[in-house]
Amino acid sequence: MSESLTANLIVPDLQALVTDIAAESIVSRTVYKDDGLRAILFGFAPGETLSEHTSSFPAILHFLEGEAAVTLGAESIAAQPGTWVHMPAHLPHSIEAQTTVKMLLLMLTS
């Protein structure tokens, strides 16, 4: 990652920030954080689950690699590369990786 003098953040290869995802693990790396946004890159090993939970903030999930089963309240979807999901605050949701998954979480914190 590099930051210019104007405080722009440029990440040439976002997926490269999470590598070597060990079996039976979920890894995360904060890419960006300010008063209004938190960007976190997740890597899931196949079969790993982020159990049902809620967030106090609206959020966006952008799936970059792999396939996952995603539950959003009563709705279930099959996520694949390119899947983009907006979730309102307090929506129960969970993610189960079917394959190795890389996903960008954008939490809208203001």
Which residue stretches match the model-derived regions?
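A cytosolic small-molecule/anion-sensing beta-strand core signal
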Residues: 64-65, 80-81, 99
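Short, conserved beta-strand element in jelly-roll/cupin
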Residues: 43-45, 56-70
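Conserved short histidine dyad/triad with adjacent acidic residue
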Residues: 25, 35-55
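A short, N-terminal "cap"/entry segment at the start of jelly-roll beta-barrel domains
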Residues: 1-36, 71
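Short acidic-glycine-tyrosine-enriched beta hairpin
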Residues: 74-89
